[in-house]
Design a protein with these regions (language model features):
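Positively charged n-region of N-terminal signal peptides that target proteins for export
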Residues: 1-5
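Bacterial N-terminal signal peptides
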Residues: 7-17
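Exposed acidic/Ser/Thr-rich ligand/metal-binding surfaces
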Residues: 23-26, 37-38, 43-46, 54-61, ...
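Membrane-proximal juxtamembrane linkers immediately C-terminal to transmembrane helices
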Residues: 31-35
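An active-site-proximal "capping" alpha-helix that borders the catalytic cofactor pocket
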Residues: 55-76
Length: 216
């Protein structure tokens, strides 16, 4: 009887050891912790994107595809101050966000990047999940050329800092991305700027962005 009992105990120990070995990260690798995020994708729909709109829509969708189960996202399109629209409120549904992205369209107007960021930041504060561990941020897709925002950058930055909202920018342009405003928005809010030299670099940048925004 003792031999049988000893054999059972040995089998249990071996089983637990095997289970631990299977779940243990491989040597030389680490498992990165991630935090849940509440964020808005804020997309420039001004005339300078007329020939690039399809690509911009795909970039927005690719960002959404990186979402984790606990992430919640809203989508804003903008041109001028009076043409800032919430296309999709907070949702965890990738399908809803994809459908909203397909509704984007280019139109004329004096681009108001700062006003769009302020609009989106205030929506984020008002509607986001209030979990303490949840990171709040905005992802801005733009060429960086602000033509006529009513707000000054100092006003926008104060609201971002007061509410611990980080801004990340994917700078896209057929010519040259204007970095004066987006440099301040990203650096002073604790975010980061990504400017691909060619569109072929965008997929890798989206992967890097996804990791960056979710790493504590």
């Amino acid at each position: 009887m003792k031999k049988v009992f000893s054999s059972i105990v040995l089998l249990l120990v071996l089983s637990l050891a095997n289970s631990f070995a299977q779940n243990k990260p491989a040597a030389g690798t680490t498992q990165k912790a991630t935090v849940p995020i509440s964020y808005g994708i804020v997309v420039d729909n001004s005339g300078s994107f007329r020939s690039m709109l399809d690509r911009i829509i795909e970039i927005a969708k690719d960002i959404v595809e990186e979402n984790k189960a606990d992430d919640e996202t809203f989508l804003v399109r903008f041109v001028s101050t009076d043409k800032i629209s919430l296309l999709q409120d907070f949702t965890v549904s990738k399908d809803e966000l994809h459908r909203a992205a397909d509704e984007m369209y280019v139109e004329g107007g004096l681009t108001a990047i700062l006003d769009a960021v302020d609009f989106s930041a205030r929506h984020l504060v008002e509607k986001a999940n209030s979990e303490a561990s949840r990171r709040k941020l905005l992802i801005l897709l733009t060429d960086g050329d602000d033509r006529q925002s009513k707000l000054k950058i100092e006003e926008v930055l104060k609201f971002l800092k007061d509410n611990q909202i980080r801004v990340y920018v994917v700078g896209i342009s057929e010519e040259k991305v204007s970095t004066k405003i987006i440099d301040r928005l990203t650096k002073e809010s604790g975010g980061k700027k990504f400017v691909p030299k060619t569109l072929s670099e965008v997929p890798a940048i989206i992967k890097e962005l996804s990791t960056t925004i979710r790493t504590p």
